[in-house]
């Protein structure tokens, strides 16, 4: 590892000082580039985090001021990569990213305050979409005020910058247990950003980003080498993720992004299922309330009411619930339950074949074991006495729609009055539409039991509730009748020519009336349908009366069948057990095969991904190298052009020659310099010739001037001598007068002081007499103090000398020990070298003897038989060892 701070220019304090100096001279981009190069360098891995953090913070400030989002993102990634293995590296990263986001938010707030506008809530602009030429042209020719466009240009870039900052920071902090608290904080800030500025497109992208992060957490392999991995089994971690998803759900509902809200509900339910800890009741109540709103938007009345039912179960247990709130939510629960449309008897009320999976999914979101029904919800309301909390008008509506109090021809006015009263509350008002349709269909069903034919106008009038804010028109009522007939709630035909409605009832089909609808009377079709059942019952009673033994025979046969079943139950149980074993074995074999197949697929996928990543890395490295070379060539070319242009401008500025700055392609710096030098040499030669001629002319002129001025110089010298003599006499007289004056003043002062000398001497003697003892005492103390100081200094010098001698002795001993160890190592090394040399000599001698022996053996074999000589067989290790011992014995 290289020592830290080896290069003076690489020290953090020097880099920081350099950046501050550049900022002071208003070169912020240069300072940013300096800090960026330092932060992204791999050499900072060996520096202290405390030294790097101020540099990273200053870099973030400059990047935000200059709006360099991509540079800041890359710097943050590199900073995390370089310091994350340090002890406090990740804490420093969190401080830096928080500072980055805070600065971006502050800039956005300042820009918005400077623009002094409110962000247009209705304009859903995508922050990731850059301006197109068409949009620029449209903004230029539009009638929008120029000041408004300028103000928007101030705010929108900072909106985009802050959004990119959120994305970059979340990508840096994701999937790390040490940064999950800061990650959660940034997520909440991003949610508030989307809600504050109504950024629906960005909110969708943010939700997808968070889902990708949690998907990575759930699918990442749990290996021992994984550091700082997110543990979803930890209660605090799962609670943080739940808080994030609940915030996401609340914001999506407030932004009216219902599809995203449903996905958020699914995310919350997945986390709740994975969590070992039950969420807080307040959070679950909020969950069910938002789910009810989502179901209301999707027109799913059944699950809308079921969600309000789950919400009220939790809310009614809250100690903070007031009577008004309980009454409000209970009324909503009852109204939503009454608004559930009834289903016909020819379809399964709980599970519709086309929506089986959907209903099961929605039931699981509500934590229900089975699909709810209208009947079960009504029974729940009655059994839990929820009607005691509801508003009086809602309770009265529930009683009116009861099974025994529903009269189709007289109930219309009463229901209309209740609807008018319910419409006064804005939260109850939106249930009137579905209640109107449900009540109308039920009225039509009751009428179909009483009448066979009615007038169409009469039937339509039964579905129009006058006096309410929401009422159906005649065409809408007719459409409702057609839909009810299509769904199987009614069986009728409409003759528009005569305006007559005919109710149909086939005796060979199931009743089309809903099973929950009370019957006013039994229709002829019902009588025909039950005739066969009554006939069978009568025949059974007749047989029992004619032949009393028939019952006993049936009982005996039943007992015999039971005995046979009991006798064969053990064999059947054994067969079942064997079948279970076979099935388990088959299942185990299938599981093993599937697991092997999955492992093989995972291995192949991992290898493929590794190969793709390696190829991608190689491609990126090659691309990066190519771009670097191209950038270097461009920079070199640009530098050459700049230098060429600069030289040409200097030449033009000096006026040496005139060069066309727009036509420099065929010229390089060397040619320009040669042209400049040639022109300078030419100018120099011309100047020298001019100077030579001028100097020759100047010599003759100067000689004439000097001859003419000689007569005037002599006269001037005489006048100057006379003037200097006068000046000397004047200065001399002034000095003598001043000296006399000073002497007289000093003599007078001496006489004045002489009169004071006797008094001064007497006063001095008195003072000396008074302070004589004190002066002696002070002198003695000073002398004693001086002696003590001398003695202490002597002792200090002795101690320092002793310590110095001891230190020298220790250093000498240490040096001797080091020298001894060095000599010992040298001796051992020399000994080892000597042994190696001797061993090599022995090996050489052995090789020579072996060659002699082999030659002797070969000569003997050649003498015995003239056959072709065989190749020398290499000696084994045992033969070599034996030969070595023989040689050692001979020596």
Curated annotation (Swiss-Prot):
Gene3D superfamilies referenced in this protein's UniProt entry, alphabetically: 1.25.40.860, UVR domain
Localization per record: Cytoplasm
Gene Ontology biological process terms from the UniProt entry: formation of cytoplasmic translation initiation complex; translation reinitiation
Chief location of this protein within or outside the cell: cytoplasm
Coiled coil (UniProt feature): 72-121, 593-849
Ranges for region Disordered: 604-627, 809-828, 854-877
Any GO CC annotation of this UniProt entry: eukaryotic 48S preinitiation complex
A GO term, aspect molecular function: translation initiation factor activity
InterPro entries for the chain: EIF3A, eIF3a_PCI_TPR-like, PCI_dom
Compositionally biased spans, kind Low complexity: 860-874
Keywords, ordered alphabetically: Coiled coil, Cytoplasm, Initiation factor, Protein biosynthesis, RNA-binding
Start and end residues of each PCI domain: 326-508
Oligomeric form and interacting partners: Component of the eukaryotic translation initiation factor 3 (eIF-3) complex.
Family label: Belongs to the eIF-3 subunit A family.
Function: RNA-binding component of the eukaryotic translation initiation factor 3 (eIF-3) complex, which is involved in protein synthesis of a specialized repertoire of mRNAs and, together with other initiation factors, stimulates binding of mRNA and methionyl-tRNAi to the 40S ribosome. The eIF-3 complex specifically targets and initiates translation of a subset of mRNAs involved in cell proliferation.
Entry protein name: Eukaryotic translation initiation factor 3 subunit A
Organism: Meyerozyma guilliermondii (strain ATCC 6260 / CBS 566 / DSM 6381 / JCM 1539 / NBRC 10279 / NRRL Y-324) (Yeast)
Gene this chain is encoded by: TIF32
């Amino acid at each position: 590892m290289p020592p830290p701070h080896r290069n003076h220019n690489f020290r953090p304090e020097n880099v920081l000082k350099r950046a501050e100096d550049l900022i002071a001279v208003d070169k912020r981009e240069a300072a940013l580039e300096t800090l960026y190069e330092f932060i992204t360098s791999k050499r900072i891995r060996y520096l202290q985090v405390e030294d790097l953090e101020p540099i990273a913070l200053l870099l973030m400030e400059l990047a935000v001021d200059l709006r360099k989002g991509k540079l800041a993102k890359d710097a943050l990634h590199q900073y995390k990569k370089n310091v994350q293995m340090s002890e406090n590296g990740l804490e420093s990263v969190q401080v830096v990213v928080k500072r980055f986001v805070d600065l971006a938010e502050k800039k956005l707030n300042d820009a918005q305050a400077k623009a002094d506008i409110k962000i247009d809530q209705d304009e859903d602009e995508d922050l990731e979409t850059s301006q197109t030429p068409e949009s620029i042209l449209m903004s230029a020719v539009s009638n929008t005020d120029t000041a408004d466009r300028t103000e928007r240009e101030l705010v929108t870039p900072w909106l985009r910058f802050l959004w990119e900052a959120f994305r970059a920071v979340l990508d840096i902090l994701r999937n790390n247990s040490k940064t999950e608290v800061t990650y959660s904080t940034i997520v909440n800030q991003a949610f508030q950003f989307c809600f504050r500025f109504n950024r629906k497109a960005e909110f969708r992208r943010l939700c997808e980003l968070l889902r990708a992060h949690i998907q990575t957490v759930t699918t990442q392999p749990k290996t021992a080498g994984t550091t700082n991995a997110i543990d979803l089994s930890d209660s605090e971690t799962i609670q943080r993720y739940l808080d994030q998803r609940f915030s996401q759900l609340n914001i999506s509902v407030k932004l009216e992004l219902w599809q995203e809200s449903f996905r958020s509900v699914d995310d919350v339910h997945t986390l709740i299922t994975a969590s070992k800890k039950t969420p807080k009741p307040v959070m679950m109540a909020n969950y069910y309330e938002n789910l009810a709103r989502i179901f209301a938007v999707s027109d799913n009345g059944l699950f809308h009411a079921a969600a309000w039912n789950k919400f009220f179960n939790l809310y009614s247990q809250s100690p903070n619930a007031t009577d008004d709130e309980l009454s409000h939510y209970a009324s909503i629960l009852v109204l939503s339950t009454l608004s559930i449309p009834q289903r016909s008897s020819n379809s399964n009320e709980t599970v519709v074949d086309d929506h089986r999976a959907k209903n099961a999914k929605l039931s699981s979101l509500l934590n229900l074991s089975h699909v709810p029904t209208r009947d079960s919800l009504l029974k729940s309301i009655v059994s839990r006495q929820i009607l005691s909390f509801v508003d009086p008008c809602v309770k009265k509506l529930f009683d009116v729609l009861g099974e025994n109090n529903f009269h189709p021809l007289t109930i219309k006015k009463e229901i209309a009055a209740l609807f008018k009263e319910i419409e006064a509350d804005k939260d109850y008002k939106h249930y009137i539409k579905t209640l109107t349709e449900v009540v109308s269909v039920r009225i039509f069903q009751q009428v179909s039991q009483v009448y066979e034919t009615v007038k169409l106008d009469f039937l339509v009038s039964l579905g129009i509730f006058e006096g309410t804010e929401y009422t159906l028109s005649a065409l809408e009522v007719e459409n409702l009748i057609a839909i009810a007939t299509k769904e199987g709630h009614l069986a009728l035909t409409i003759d528009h020519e005569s305006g007559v409605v005919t109710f149909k009832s086939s005796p060979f089909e199931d009743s089309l009336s809903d099973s929950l609808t009370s019957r006013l009377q039994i229709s002829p079709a019902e009588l025909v349908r039950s005739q066969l059942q009554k006939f069978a019952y009568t025949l059974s009673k007749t047989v029992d009366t004619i032949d009393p033994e028939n019952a006993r025979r049936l009982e005996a046969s039943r007992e015999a069948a039971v005995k046979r079943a009991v006798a064969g139950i053990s064999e059947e149980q054994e067969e079942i057990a064997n079948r279970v074993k076979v099935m388990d074995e088959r299942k185990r074999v299938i599981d093993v095969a599937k697991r092997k197949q999955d492992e093989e697929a995972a291995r192949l996928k991992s290898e493929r991904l590794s190969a793709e990543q390696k190829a991608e890395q190689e491609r990126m490295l090659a691309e990066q190298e190519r771009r670097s070379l191209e950038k270097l060539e461009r920079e070199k070319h640009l530098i050459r052009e700049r230098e060429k242009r600069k030289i040409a401008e200097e030449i033009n500025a000096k006026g040496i020659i005139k060069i066309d700055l727009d036509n420099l392609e065929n010229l390089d710096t060397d040619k320009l310099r040669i042209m400049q030098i040639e022109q300078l040499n030419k100018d120099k030669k011309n100047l020298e010739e001019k100077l030579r001629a001028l100097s020759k002319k100047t010599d003759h002129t100067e000689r004439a001037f000097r001859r003419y001025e000689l007569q005037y110089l002599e006269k001037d010298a005489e006048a100057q001598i006379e003037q200097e003599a006068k000046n000397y006499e004047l200065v001399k007289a002034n000095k003598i007068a001043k000296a006399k004056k000073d002497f007289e003043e000093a003599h007078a002062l001496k006489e004045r002081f002489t009169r004071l000398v006797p008094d001064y001497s007497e006063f001095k003697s008195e003072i000396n007499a008074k302070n004589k003892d004190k002066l002696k005492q002070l002198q003695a103390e000073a002398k004693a103090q001086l002696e003590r100081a001398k003695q202490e200094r002597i002792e200090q010098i002795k101690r320092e000398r002793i310590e110095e001698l001891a230190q020298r002795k220790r250093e000498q001993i240490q040096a001797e020990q080091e020298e001894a160890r060095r000599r010992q190592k040298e001796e051992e090394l020399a000994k080892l070298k000597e042994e190696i040399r001797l061993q090599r000599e022995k090996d050489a001698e052995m090789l020579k003897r072996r060659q002699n022996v082999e030659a002797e053996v070969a000569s003997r074999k050649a003498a015995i038989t003239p056959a072709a000589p065989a190749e020398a067989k290499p000696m084994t290790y045992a033969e070599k060892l034996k030969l070595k011992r023989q040689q050692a014995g001979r020596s």
